[in-house]
């Protein structure tokens, strides 16, 4: 899950992860499906090679069910990019349930040897329906001053005191386009990253942080 206001760097980060040689997701997937009203309009579109039947400008139940039928029993490594489709999701509770089902059964949807990964973007973290955002295993948060958003992130994810959480935010967002990366399933001492550099705590309550 990637959360950031317009211009924060969400799209650039997706392109970097997927398209740049040696990066995390470069050439890791057999199929990529994109659900986005805007990614197809990028200048020098890096997704031009993706077949038309894997690129959608909206997201609904019928489209997603059709895609799930296509990948069933293929054994493929599949990536869904759900970019800027929060409004489609929020207004459709059946779609929300289907997405939750996908997120909770990612390893079984494409058959033996296959898997489904999902990258979802939003301009505001708490605009994503709670049942969906609570299934996220990795969360990337760009700078925000939205107190309700930060309080939601803190209440749902953060196990350190709020004062320390805000010190982590201040330390992380010292440069434009920096992001806080959370590995949700890690223990509290190993879940925080400034960009992709893990924050090291000398003690459980010490915020004198050092990068790997």
What residues fall within each predicted segment?
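Intrinsically disordered, low-complexity N-terminal regions enriched in serine/proline/glycine
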Residues: 24, 28, 141, 180, ...
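Short, aromatic/basic amphipathic alpha-helical patches
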Residues: 43-52
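An amphipathic, basic-hydrophobic helix/alpha-beta surface used to engage anionic
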Residues: 32
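Conserved P-loop NTPase motor cores
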Residues: 1-23, 27, 37-41, 56-163
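P-loop/Walker A phosphate-binding loop and immediately adjacent motor/lid segment at beta-alpha junctions
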Residues: 150-188
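Conserved P-loop NTPase motor module
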Residues: 1-4, 175-212
């Amino acid at each position: 899950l990637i959360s950031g206001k317009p211009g924060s760097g969400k799209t650039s980060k997706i392109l970097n992860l997927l398209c740049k040689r040696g990066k995390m997701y470069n050439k890791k997937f057999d199929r990529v499906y994109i659900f986005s009203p805007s990614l197809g309009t990028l200048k020098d579109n890096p997704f031009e090679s993706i077949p038309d039947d894997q690129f959608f400008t909206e997201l609904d139940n019928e489209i997603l069910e059709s895609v799930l039928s296509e990948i069933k029993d293929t054994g493929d490594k599949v990536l869904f990019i759900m970019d800027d489709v929060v409004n489609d999701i929020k207004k459709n509770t059946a779609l929300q349930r289907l997405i939750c089902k996908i997120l909770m059964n990612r390893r079984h949807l494409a058959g033996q040897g296959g898997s489904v990964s999902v990258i979802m973007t939003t301009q505001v973290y708490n605009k994503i329906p709670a049942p969906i955002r609570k299934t996220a295993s990795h969360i990337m948060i760009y700078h925000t001053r939205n107190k309700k958003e930060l309080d939601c992130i803190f209440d749902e994810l953060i196990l350190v005191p709020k004062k320390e959480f805000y010190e982590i935010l201040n330390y992380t967002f010292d440069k434009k386009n920096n992001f806080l990366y959370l590995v949700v399933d890690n223990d509290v001492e190993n879940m925080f990253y400034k960009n992709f550099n893990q924050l090291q705590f000398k003690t459980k309550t010490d915020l004198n942080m050092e990068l790997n």
